[in-house]
Amino acid sequence: MNAFKQREVWFAIGSQHLYGPQTLQQVKAHAEQVVDSLNREAGLPVKLVLKPLVTTPDEITALCRDANYQPQCIGILAWLHTFSPAKMWIAGLSVLHKPLLQFHTQFNAQVPWDSMDMDFMNLNQTAHGGREFGFIGARMRQQHSVIAGHWQDPEAHRRIGQWMRVASAKQAGQQLKVARFGDNMREVAVTDGDKVGAQIQFGYSVNAYGIGDLVSVINEVSRGDVDTLIEEYEASYVLSDAAKINGAKRENLTDAARIELGMKRFLEQGNFQAFTTNFEDLHGMKQLPGLAVQRLMQQGYGFGGEGDWKTAALLRILKVMADGLHGGTSFMEDYTYHFQPGNDLVVGSHMLEVCPSIAREPKPLLDIQPLGIGGKADPARLIFSTPAGPAVNASLIDMGDRFRLLVNQVDTVEQPHPLPKLPVARAIWRAQPTLATAAEAWILAGGAHHTVFSQALDADMLRLYAEMHNIEFLLIDQDTTLPAFKNELRWNEAYYQLNRR
């Protein structure tokens, strides 16, 4: 995806002229060394760009305004090397719209016991300079993140990298366009919601298009382009007998390829990065898009079934966040349970649309099987299982007065038995802390049946995403108990009612 290409985080150093030019020169030299080291050795996904030292209110305000207007800048990392009186930051922070991270570090890792003098103390004042900066953020009620630790500490590197990923995802969300092919599945509640409110909160736009608009683009796809794509299928997947040349369903594969090319062309022409479909809106299409949706998700597009635009947008945003990390990220649905004492499991899947980025098999099976839902021809789909490992399920829901991000930590397991008659991709997991507690908590919180499933991301990154957007975050994990979770729901309700703007 190259999600972080041409992105940068501005590294800002705050100080004041009180200390004199020699001290400020040392601060600049230290900053250059820190930024150079972090860019070379910390494995950060986004480049740090050192900005000129800011020592006056006007310089700080100019920096913050410039950050807002430069599209390559996804946020500011601030280091208070010396004491920078925080009233100087009020005007700048008041206009700053990009994410802010305070890196509470200092140049030296240890105190030089034998040589430390007052010059050293004046130069290395992060310990209290950072507190002054933190106060003004708290006083202004401004959302910002804080990471404390030495700049050579791998844990600090990891956390800065996570913050960069979330800041990049936030910017991607602000630029995101979601196309809905058709409307919401009739009478379904949770997939609907306030699209205007979402655009105000997150920045992404959601617009619907008649299925005929898509069909007209699909019908323009040439046979030569279809044949080229089918050659790619044959190189990438294990084709079932029905899908092979002269197979009983070969024409269905041709139709699926034409649908994929048409959908991608439509999305590219409109600069959409996420989309939804609905099996109730298929007029003019030969089959429900399955293979097309799976492959588009693997290329980085967000997707939601049955018109679920919130999950489509969230999937795209989390794919940006996860770019380059080990593990995949997919549209998902809790489909059925396996109740067994000591071994309760959830089978996650969907009618067709599970992203191959989570596939365990190097070459998934490409098959064509009947699908009663939608009333169309048998659709092509990729069939695979998912590797074992930790994962999260995330659901963004509209609570009317606010958005809520609900996350359940799960442990994916290897498929324990063959599923010879199940013609869809799937993931199987143990919900934390138990299936019963996780399901009850999820239902009490109003979590959707659609989720984003990710083996690349963790709950900390999703919590940070929620914090950057000032939305509610609820976590169901190994430490969750139902009485405490119910209390959290009550407390949150009171907080958000009192904090309404």
From Swiss-Prot:
EC number of the protein: 5.3.1.4
Binding residues for Mn(2+): E306, E333, H350, H450
Any one annotated GO CC term: cytosol
SUPFAM superfamilies: FucI/AraA C-terminal domain-like, FucI/AraA N-terminal and middle domains
A Pfam match: Arabinose_Iso_C
Annotated pathway: Carbohydrate degradation; L-arabinose degradation via L-ribulose; D-xylulose 5-phosphate from L-arabinose (bacterial route): step 1/3
Cofactor: Mn(2+)
InterPro entries: Ara_Isoase_C, AraA_central, AraA_N, AraA_N_sf, Fuc/Ara_isomerase_C, Fucose_isomerase_N/cen_sf, Lara_isomerase
Entry's cofactor comment: Binds 1 Mn(2+) ion per subunit.
Entry GO MF terms: L-arabinose isomerase activity; manganese ion binding
Record bears the keyword Mitochondrion: no
Catalytically driven reaction(s): beta-L-arabinopyranose = L-ribulose
Listed GO biological process terms: L-arabinose catabolic process to xylulose 5-phosphate
Keywords for this protein: Arabinose catabolism, Carbohydrate metabolism, Isomerase, Manganese, Metal-binding
Quaternary organization: Homohexamer.
HAMAP family per UniProt: Arabinose_Isome
Matching NCBIfam families: PRK02929.1 (NF002795)
Family of this protein: Belongs to the arabinose isomerase family.
Function: Catalyzes the conversion of L-arabinose to L-ribulose.
Name of the protein this chain belongs to: L-arabinose isomerase
Taxonomic lineage of the native organism: Bacteria, Pseudomonadati, Pseudomonadota, Gammaproteobacteria, Enterobacterales
Gene: araA
